[in-house]
Amino acid sequence: MKEFFGFGGYQREPAGYFSWQHIVFVTCFMIVMVATAVYFGRRNRHSSDSEKNKVLIWAAILIDSFEIFKIVIMCIRGKDPMGWITELPLFLCSIQLITIPLAAFSKGRVKEAALDFVFIFGILGAVLGTYFAGQNYSCYPVLSFDNAVSAVTHSISGFASLYIVISGMESMKKKNIPITFAILLSFCVMAYTANVLIPYNYMFLMRGDGTPYDIFYNLVGGSPVFYPMVVVLLFVLYICAFWGVYTFVKKKTAERKLHANVEKTEEESAMV
């Protein structure tokens, strides 16, 4: 148990980024994530908004509870009561520690925008924070406290994203897009400010650190000006692309349903 939590440092060697142990480990979490999202989403598809929201409330409580537990353990393990400074929810993935509770407990347009934000970024964070968490799986053994809690919290983010769309909680209204952008840009500003003051690498705005962002970091030669601008631009473009694809799929689905209903009506008329 001491070895799992990393007290005194991990004695086992990391299996490595994209090792078969890494892939099998995170894939197990992804399977559970998708299965539970489909189960609860389909079960609550035609339930009231309050019933649908209960699942999201539990997701909010669980993700924050695991994260708080992780921070406490890491502060004890590192014998540093200020260790929480480098564990602030200012990564793209960990923003869900705030936005999932916001989606669960707020009301009106703020709730709609928060639900859309979790829907848009939850699944992205789940994939990036598990399969592409190069820094974690290069530094820690696969079966370790750090990787286990990270996999759990990222899976909850992905679960919330999938559950929202499967249960029909998303709105994706044009009028709420500015609020979604405002949420994202606010976190980017806070992350960059924290990076300068601590210093740290929240939101990977300073460097790639073994993530896919390394590609863009190298493209701009590590420029402290252009690199963070590129990262933020990628976030904005992702929102636009996600919204565009969602709108297109929604439109095509509605057209197919309309066409099917017309054919059904014509068949019924012919039978009469």
Located regions from the model:
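Membrane-interface transmembrane-helix boundary segments in multi-pass integral membrane proteins
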Residues: 11-29, 179, 185, 196-239
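Hydrophobic core of alpha-helical transmembrane segments in multi-pass integral membrane proteins
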Residues: 23-41, 62-69, 188, 232-244
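Alpha-helical transmembrane segments in multipass membrane proteins, preferentially the mid-helix core
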Residues: 34-39, 99-103, 156-175
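Membrane-interface helix-boundary motifs at transmembrane edges
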Residues: 42-56, 105-114, 167-178
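A glycine-rich, hydrophobic loop/mini-helix early in the fold
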Residues: 51-104
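Aromatic-anchored segments of alpha-helical transmembrane domains
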Residues: 63-72, 122-133, 184-193
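Alpha-helical transmembrane segments and their immediate interhelical/interface regions
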Residues: 68-87, 138-169
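Membrane-proximal helix-loop-helix units in multi-pass membrane proteins
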Residues: 102-161
